[in-house]
């Protein structure tokens, strides 16, 4: 249970950070004129799997 709670908190923090980074990158690419149609949202499934495997709670 603790693992799940930690995962949720980490996931929320990562999502916020990822959105911020993606937004910055997209802004930069738009300014550069090299916008390569980035996905609007990061691949949550991959992130979740990554966190899960690193926390060791499969």
Curated annotation (Swiss-Prot):
Subcellular location: Plastid, Chloroplast
Major location category of this protein: plastid
GO CC terms, sorted: chloroplast
Keywords carried by this UniProt record: Chloroplast, Plastid
Record-given protein name: Uncharacterized 6.2 kDa protein in psaC-petL intergenic region
Annotated organism of origin: Chlamydomonas reinhardtii (Chlamydomonas smithii)
Lineage: Eukaryota, Viridiplantae, Chlorophyta, core chlorophytes, Chlorophyceae
